[in-house]
Structure formats: structure tokens, C-alpha cells
């Protein structure tokens, strides 16, 4: 099960969602603002006003930290 996390530096929720996934040995790749994508590309992908982090599981958009943790709980992954 692979997750893709869109992050920015200095984001505590980005750190938290990565810690949750790492704590359960769930694999993920990280894409960082300005290193892998621009803010404009981020808004095109997730919608204007979207916040960090944004998490995908395959092509499914899970949302931010809270939504991702909810998804993991509902699917008995944490």
C-alpha cells in the first residue's frame, strides 16, 4: 500500500502524517513544495485553497492529516 504525500517545509501536520505512516510501517513517497511542484501545480491538482499536507493513495485523494488518519482508522490500518 503506497501513499503519496504533498508537503511543504515547516508544516507540523505534514510531519505528523509522515510519523503516523512510518509508525505503522506504511510506505509513502513525499513530494515537497518548490522541490517537486509549484504552488500553482498544487492548486491545480487539489483545488484552490487546499492546505498541506495532501495525501493520495493511488489515484484516490484522501485529504489532509485529519482525513488521512480517519481513513487509516476506518480501514483498520492504525
Indicate residue ranges for each PLM-predicted region:
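Structural micro-motif
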Residues: 46-56, 65-66
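Alpha-helical elements of the RecA-like P-loop NTPase motor core of helicases
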Residues: 15, 40, 70
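Short alpha-helical
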Residues: 12, 37, 63
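Thioredoxin-like thiol-disulfide oxidoreductase module
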Residues: 32-49
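Local sequence-structure signature of Cys/Sec-based thiol-disulfide redox active-site neighborhoods
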Residues: 1-26
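Conserved beta-strand scaffold positions in the cores of enzyme catalytic domains, especially
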Residues: 25-30, 61
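Non-catalytic, surface beta->alpha helical segment in thiol-disulfide oxidoreductase systems
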Residues: 57-78
Amino acid at each position: 500500500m503506497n501513499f503519496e504525500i504533498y508537503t511543504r517545509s515547516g508544516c507540523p501536520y505534514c510531519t505528523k502524517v509522515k510519523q503516523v505512516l512510518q509508525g505503522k510501517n506504511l510506505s509513502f513517497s513525499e513530494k515537497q513544495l518548490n522541490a517537486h511542484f509549484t504552488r500553482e501545480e498544487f492548486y491545480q491538482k487539489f483545488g484552490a485553497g487546499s492546505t498541506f499536507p495532501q495525501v493520495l493513495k493511488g489515484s484516490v485523494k484522501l485529504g489532509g492529516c485529519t482525513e488521512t488518519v480517519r481513513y487509516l482508522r476506518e480501514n483498520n490500518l492504525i
